[in-house]
């Protein structure tokens, strides 16, 4: 907030903010009377897989289950965001909704097995109601101009 004072005092016509949507909102809130515009569209929190390709990693759901699922997020990695195990529709380890993706729950099972924590699969977690979304998303610049 204190760092915004020189900007506000300069009375610019507008502010173009190079940040995620939260940053744009923060600047707008602290720059009264100054229009604030995003320079980019925030898609999601993800990780770079290789140049020009990112994969979604977190939904900021506020009810993190990573400690129970071996560090693999079922809300983000499962297309149906199932938190208590697989849907049963996977084929050859691939997701039935998006066959390009590995089944999140097979990945979770393998990870928990690897770290000696398969007992965590027996815990029931409350459904988060994220079924209306389709995750994980991937953004690729390949073929874009």
Predicted regions span which residues?
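Iron-sulfur (Fe-S) cluster-binding modules
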Residues: 2-15, 28-68, 72-145
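Short, well-ordered alpha-helical microsegments
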Residues: 23-26
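N-terminal glycine-rich "phosphate-gripper" loop used for MgATP/nucleotide binding
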Residues: 17-21
């Amino acid at each position: 907030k204190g760092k915004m004072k020189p900007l506000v005092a300069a009375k610019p016509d507008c502010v173009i903010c190079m940040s995620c949507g939260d940053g744009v909102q923060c600047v707008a809130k602290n720059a009264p009377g100054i229009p604030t515009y995003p320079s980019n569209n925030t898609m999601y929190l993800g990780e770079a897989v290789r140049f020009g390709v990112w994969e979604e990693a977190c939904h900021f759901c506020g009810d993190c289950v990573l400690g129970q699922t071996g560090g693999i997020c079922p809300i983000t990695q499962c297309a149906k965001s199932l938190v208590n195990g697989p849907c049963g529709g996977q084929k050859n380890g691939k997701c039935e909704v998006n066959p390009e993706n590995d089944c999140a729950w097979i990945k979770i099972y393998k990870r928990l097995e690897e770290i000696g924590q398969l007992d965590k699969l027996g815990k029931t977690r409350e459904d988060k109601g994220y079924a209306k979304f389709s995750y994980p998303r991937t953004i690729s610049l390949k073929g874009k101009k």
